[in-house]
A protein has these predicted regions:
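C-terminal regulatory/interaction module of P-loop NTP-utilizing enzymes
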Residues: 1-158
Length: 158
């Protein structure tokens, strides 16, 4: 089951009514965990993000949604039916819902439970941009900058 974790993706940055890009969930959580265990944060192992911190059901849903989007977007625009376009619109809305779920699950956990006294040590990218260290501002920044709020700039887009 852990081998399958490498196949899961997370949508990032909701721009132009769709996700700007996707990154691997395992890569992202590993990088966040590396930040959490760094000298600046020194978080205990029991507070790290496990492979299924985001539920397997949601990870499966996200993966299936992305596969359907890729399939429809591979079609020539002129050959897409009205039904295809409506389906794409719905799938892109789901991407936004997944981004919101990431905020309410992962970002909230990191902000409230893990780094409540020092949020600038995990939300490094947001802090460097002089962003306010309040939950709503961090979420807004996440919708614009995705993984960049953690100071992560080099994960492969999928």
């Amino acid at each position: 089951q852990v081998a399958a974790i490498k196949d899961y993706v997370i949508p990032m940055c909701f721009k132009d009514n769709k996700a700007d890009h996707y990154i691997g969930w395992d890569s992202l959580r590993t990088r966040i965990n590396n930040i959490l265990t760094s000298e600046k944060c020194k978080v205990n192992e029991d507070k790290l993000l496990g492979p299924f911190f985001i539920s397997k059901n949601m990870l499966d849903e996200i993966k299936n949604n992305k596969e359907q989007i890729d399939e429809l977007e591979a079609k020539d625009e002129a050959s897409r039916t009205e039904k295809d376009n409506e389906a794409l619109k719905d799938m892109h809305q789901k991407e936004n819902n997944y981004i919101k779920a990431f905020e309410s699950k992962v970002i909230m956990y990191l902000f409230e439970d893990v780094m409540k006294m020092r949020p600038e040590n995990i939300f490094i990218g947001h802090h460097k941009k002089n962003g306010k260290m309040i939950f709503s501002e961090i979420c807004k920044a996440f919708e614009q900058d995705g993984e960049g709020i953690f100071g992560i700039e080099d994960l492969e887009n999928i």
